[in-house]
Design a protein with these regions (language model features):
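Glycosyltransferase donor-sugar binding loop
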Residues: 41-45, 192-196, 221-234, 250
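Nucleotide-activated donor-binding/catalytic signature segment of Leloir-type glycosyltransferases, i.e.
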Residues: 234-252
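Aromatic "clamp/platform" in nucleotide-sugar-dependent glycosyltransferases that forms part
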Residues: 272
């Protein structure tokens, strides 16, 4: 049986985006099960921290990725898969599996991956197959990513679709400042950006839809947030005359994001591309209605609008806002993937029902409204 040590390699908060939050939550899940977890933060701009290993230099980071895990450990790389930089990381983790006998696991997060690998030529596809072969498991955030990986022609590599959502373990309260902000808007829309090369592109669609809805809902307001959000969005708010109806917070902590999601009347996800948006599932876990663009994949329980279509978004928001506001916990779709993720790890560890002495974690509390 493999040892009880895991090295998780990926971005780690901050920033508070989907992949970093997932890495943080996965580390906690594995520790709850009795595993020793080390984190390699692949963000070269990260500040030093006792929470993770890191390196400000590219070579130093690649060396740590190659050597931090030994043959008794599991190396689990989290990356987007839609850039050369990402595939360099995949290559190095692959080499750790190929030449150092490390159990290597790969999670691919990005909805941009299918389009990226579709552009591979014959040589690139052969190289990609060689790179992916040493991975014991490849986890994909949605089915379309999984189909793209299989289309490369990887032989002998087991793939799984496990959305990057491990539940909501607590329901943070609004700060006094955010409570005042949110109570000034009724109804309150919360829009979270991310998932693509220009995270602000979809927020422009939200703002223009809000502009159409204000005559009908004069107290309506929207709070916009996300990593790398602000430089384009704040000027657009002024340009559209929405200073009294929209606030751009930019990047916020995960707890602050959860509190705002929980307080909202509708959550909007307007990206043009997505892997699996954690915030969508978090909102659904709180019983908050979600209106989201029709990307390749959205979970059960979401109201879809045509991506980029301002009028369709306005129509769908109007429909949702016209519904009763009560939240019925029994109608929430089940999205928590903790059990699926632990089942995969238990298999990798060669342990059924944690017979090796690994503990069962305490049950997670359900997200409250």
């Amino acid at each position: 049986m493999k040892g009880k040590r895991v090295v998780l390699a990926g971005f780690y908060p901050p920033p508070f985006a989907g992949e970093p939050v997932h890495v943080m939550q996965l580390a906690q899940l594995l520790r709850d099960h009795g595993l020793s977890v080390q984190i390699l933060n692949l963000n070269r701009q990260a500040s030093p921290s006792q929470d993770y290993h890191h390196s400000g230099g590219r070579l130093g980071l690649l060396w740590r990725l190659l050597t931090l895990a030994d043959r008794a450990a599991i190396l689990h790389l989290h990356t987007n898969g839609h850039s050369r930089k990402s595939w360099l990381m995949i290559l190095v983790a692959s080499l750790a599996g190929r030449f150092r006998d490390v159990t290597a696991v790969l999670t691919l997060h990005s909805g941009l991956l299918p389009g990226y690998v579709a552009g591979f030529g014959t040589i690139e596809r052969r190289l990609a197959r060689w790179i992916l072969r040493p991975f014991t498991r490849i986890i994909c955030a949605n089915p379309e990513i999984c189909r793209s990986v299989k289309a490369i022609g990887s032989v002998g590599v087991q793939t799984s679709v496990i959305p990057a959502f491990l539940g909501v373990s607590h329901a943070p309260e609004l700060s006094p400042q955010d409570r005042t902000l949110s109570e000034g808007f009724r109804p309150l829309l919360v829009a979270v950006a991310g998932g693509e090369e220009d995270p602000e592109r979809g927020l422009a669609v939200v703002l223009r839809a809000v502009q159409q809805l204000v005559p009908v809902h004069p107290d309506l307001g929207t709070i916009l947030m996300g990593w790398q959000v602000g430089p384009k969005t704040r000027p657009l708010i002024q340009e559209l005359g929405l200073a009294d109806h929209a606030v751009c917070l930019g990047e916020v902590s995960h707890d602050r994001c959860l509190a705002l999601l929980r307080a909202s009347d509708v959550v909007v996800r307007s990206t043009f591309v997505d892997g699996d948006a954690i915030t969508v599932r978090e909102a659904l876990a709180f019983g908050v209605p979600v209106v989201a663009s029709d990307t390749d994949f959205r979970p059960e329980g979401v109201t879809l609008f045509r991506r980029g279509d301002v009028s369709d978004l306005a129509v769908k928001l109007s429909h949702v806002l016209a519904q009763p506001t009560g939240r019925d916990p029994s109608r929430r779709p089940a999205h928590d993937q903790s059990a699926s993720m632990w089942e995969l790890y238990a298999e990798l560890l060669g342990s059924e029902n944690t017979a090796s002495g690994l503990v069962q974690p305490p049950p997670r509390p359900a997200a409250s409204t």
